[in-house]
Every structure is written in structure tokens, then in C-alpha cells.
Regions:
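Leu/Val/Ala/Ile-rich N-terminal alpha-helices, chiefly Sec-type signal peptides and the beginnings
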Residues: 2, 7-59
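Structured binding/interaction patches within domain cores
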Residues: 37-191
Length: 191
């Protein structure tokens, strides 16, 4: 009888794994939590966050890697549209610069706007510091920040009266206004 690994028993390790019982990186753990096929590139997770965590996971020592465990559930469902992913990529480059990493120039700079490059670059900037305990904590907080970015709210096509308040409250207010503006006889004539 073989023992199967679940998200509750898997230990985080470096690299890509063919199956959970052989270990899992933080992204593979996230795929398990998202109930997706076992992969280090789950569809429901932001590509920028995924790139950051794949690189960071593989560069950490085994002890600090386990600190990534809570992030796996946090990042499920973070995949978003272009605007949010561009903002995440931009923040990754800012995070890198804040850690002292110079951004590439010339043609290489153009590629930094992609999810894979910007996320990996930010993780590498953190890993270059050792990472120190302070930078490790900053990296964990940075992932939380990236995960909290939501798509901008678009203009709704519904009338404000419909989405602005509880419909029951709107009906009560309309009836109260009707009662003030019409007499009892007029109301009976309407019924």
C-alpha cells in the first residue's frame, strides 16, 4: 500500500515534480489547492506571481521554503486581466530596484515587462541578498501585496437605483412616497 500525498502532507521542495508524493514546489501546491491538474503553472494563478514564486521557491533553503506554504492558498484565483498583470509586473520591477538590482538596458529592458521576466527578476533580486531575514519577510509581504491587487471596477451598465441599495428598501421608500402624495381614494381607484 502506497501513501498518497495531499496538500496537507506535502513538503515544499525545489524544482518541478511529476507527482505530489515526490514533493511539490509552492506553485504545485497551489495547483492542488485550486483542484487543477498537478503543475507549477496553474491557470487560476497570476503569471507574475507564479514567476516570482517559482524562482523564489527554488532559490531558498529548505527551512525558509516552508514559509511559502501559507502563500499557496492566498494566490489561488489571482489570475487577472492585462491591466492588473501589468501593474504586478511594474511593482516587481520597483521591488527589484528597491533591493538594489539594476534593471537591464537596451533590448533586454523590453522583455522585463513580461510576467515571467518581471516576476523572476524580482525574486532573483531578493535571493541575491541571501536572502536576509529582513528581505525574506519583505518578499513574503510583497507576494501578499501582489495577490491583493484586484481588477479595476468598470462602469456598471445597471441603473444606480438598482445596484445602489437594497431593492426592498427602494420599494418601501417608493410606497411611502406614494402614500404621502396620494389620498386614500386615489389609491383605491388604482387597485
Amino acid at each position: 500500500m502506497t501513501m498518497s500525498s495531499t496538500y496537507q502532507t506535502v513538503r515544499l521542495s525545489a524544482g518541478r515534480h511529476p507527482a505530489p508524493h515526490l514533493g511539490a514546489c509552492v506553485m504545485e501546491l497551489a495547483s492542488m489547492l485550486a483542484e487543477e491538474p498537478f503543475t507549477d503553472r496553474p491557470a487560476t494563478i497570476s503569471p507574475v506571481i507564479g514567476a516570482f514564486l517559482r524562482t523564489y521557491n527554488d532559490g531558498l533553503d529548505d527551512g525558509r521554503r516552508q514559509d511559502l506554504y501559507p502563500l499557496a492558498s492566498l494566490i489561488v484565483g489571482t489570475a487577472a486581466g492585462r491591466a492588473v498583470e501589468r501593474e504586478r509586473a511594474s511593482r516587481c520591477l520597483g521591488f527589484s530596484r528597491a533591493l538594489g538590482a539594476a534593471l537591464p538596458s537596451g533590448r533586454a529592458a523590453v522583455g522585463m515587462g513580461t510576467p515571467e521576466a518581471s516576476g523572476s527578476w524580482a525574486a532573483l533580486a531578493a535571493l541575491r541578498t541571501g536572502p536576509s531575514q529582513e528581505v525574506h519577510e519583505r518578499a513574503l509581504q510583497f507576494v501578499r501585496e501582489l495577490a491583493s491587487l484586484n481588477p479595476p471596477h468598470r462602469n456598471r451598465r445597471w441603473p444606480a437605483w438598482l445596484v445602489g441599495r437594497d431593492p426592498g428598501e427602494a420599494v418601501e421608500q417608493a410606497l411611502a412616497e406614494l402614500g404621502r402624495s396620494s389620498s386614500v381614494e386615489e389609491r383605491h381607484a388604482l387597485v
